[in-house]
Amino acid sequence: MTDKLPLALFLMGPTASGKTELAIRLRQKFPVEIISVDSALIYKGMDIGTAKPDERELSLAPHRLIDILDPSESYSAADFRRDALQAMDDIVAEGKIPLLVGGTMLYYKALLEGLSPLPAANPEIRQQIEQEALTKGWSVLHDELKEIDPVSAARIHPNDPQRLSRALEVYRISGKTLTELTQTKGESLPYRVKQFAIAPKDRAELHRRIELRFDKMMEAGFEEEMKALYARKDLHPDLPSIRCVGYRQMWEYLDGECTRDEAVFRGVCATRQLAKRQITWLRSWDDLTWLDSDNIEQALETMSEAIASD
């Protein structure tokens, strides 16, 4: 049965590992179309701090699912799965192969395994939770979550109001915890998937790449990009867009919480931590072929052979 399913390629990896370069090279050799799997690239006007592919790169290899939302909006794993499946179907209908590229592991997981049947958001209950947070504080609500769902509470930081609110909301709507509901998996992906991950073999090299990229972003005008977002007045640090690595730290600088140099240092550290989490997740991933960032030619050959032999 799986032999009749269309082929899809996953190219995963930590930030600054060379995914975009490899994807563009691959598109120049094969009939693949790129779908971005990145929770930061979805936002318009957030180009420099997300290291979004530039005009030249996009002309060589257009990316779907970038620049689809305003930074004031939210986007869930369910939203991604819906949009990605539609994009994949469109690509296959054109006789091409979907190539999904990015580092948002939760999106890949949602796409592969489907989503558990969580209740839809309830604005009334959400408003009630936010009002409680104003009067009691999020730390008290986090303690409440510890009582009803210790597993989720261990994963959700007290300073993450979006996820904390959602966990409490799910329980109040359904009477079941987020942990209980997420153990029920949804519909699996109707594709034959070949999965690849690219990263430097040496962690110090990845750290060097991250620091270099952050410096280049600052030189390219990241501070000015951030100031434009800050000046809008309708954005705030609890939004998913502003919680993106780099943006949160630059917001703190513009808010007067730290100096510019401290913001850059914090941004680099936060990016390293993100990369570490991405690699940890990938190491537990099944059916994954690892590629070396320091040998793009070999990585290209490995992926090319996998496509040609299909």
Curated annotation (Swiss-Prot):
Interaction with substrate tRNA, annotated site positions: T104, R126
Catalytic activity from the UniProt record: adenosine(37) in tRNA + dimethylallyl diphosphate = N(6)-dimethylallyladenosine(37) in tRNA + diphosphate
Ligand binding (ATP): G13, P14, T15, A16, S17, G18, K19, T20
Membership in a protein family: Belongs to the IPP transferase family.
Gene3D superfamilies: 1.10.20.140, P-loop containing nucleotide triphosphate hydrolases
Role summary: Catalyzes the transfer of a dimethylallyl group onto the adenine at position 37 in tRNAs that read codons beginning with uridine, leading to the formation of N6-(dimethylallyl)adenosine (i(6)A).
Keywords on record: ATP-binding, Magnesium, Nucleotide-binding, Transferase, tRNA processing
Entry keyword annotation includes Electron transport: no
Highest taxon of the lineage: Bacteria
Region (Interaction with substrate tRNA): 38-41, 162-166, 243-248, 276-283
Binding of substrate, residues: T15, A16, S17, G18, K19, T20
Enzyme Commission code(s) on record: 2.5.1.75
UniProt subunit comment: Monomer.
Pfam family name, one: IPPT
Protein name: tRNA dimethylallyltransferase
Lineage of the species this protein comes from: Bacteria, Pseudomonadati, Pseudomonadota, Gammaproteobacteria, Vibrionales
Cofactor(s) it depends on: Mg(2+)
Molecular functions (GO terms): ATP binding; tRNA dimethylallyltransferase activity
GO biological process terms held by the UniProt record: tRNA modification
Name of the coding gene: miaA
